[in-house]
Amino acid sequence: MFGNLQGKFIIATPEMDDEYFDRTVIYICEHNDNGTIGVIINTPTDLSVLELLTRMDFQMAKPRIYTQDQMVLNGGPVNQDRGFIVHSKTDHEFTHSYKVTDDITLTTSGDVLDSFGTQTAPEKFIVCLGCSTWKPHQLEQEIAQNYWLLSEANNQTLFETSYLDRWVEANEMLGISGILAPAGRA
């Protein structure tokens, strides 16, 4: 009915009754007969990528400029002590990488973080702590129950749009706008 969801966005609808996922956009990294894994791409933590690297004691090969927008994201409620790095394709192979699409990879090993600031680093990336998982067919049921909208993913929204604008932008890609703004108070 839905086909392979890997490499797509799911967007939480107002029907979503779990506050954890309210107004989230999730990038689906793996979808197969064993279930689904994705990461929330619009919920930044208070931790920057630079702070994470410092806490992990990585020695940067050369200085790299980090902006305030490069925050670690809350990828989901599962395995919150593990890093999930979604990044553009590189010529370098990292230890635990999984091809999501022809140009996007998910890596869960620290060697990708260690590459930051070197020639082997991915050009674009998001760093998430934790992920979101579904049992086989569970996500398809949630989509059928109108908890999620399904959308094609794009690199602009995934890597470049500000975190807090990603939900609106993902909805606008589906032609949904205007009604998304939060209601004001008198």
Curated annotation (Swiss-Prot):
Coiled coil regions, renumbered to chain: none
One protein family per Pfam: DUF179
InterPro entries listed in its UniProt record: AlgH-like (IPR003774)
GO cellular component: cytosol
Gene3D superfamilies: VC0467-like
HAMAP family attached to this UniProt entry: UPF0301 (MF_00758)
Family listed: Belongs to the UPF0301 (AlgH) family.
Full protein name: UPF0301 protein HD_1794
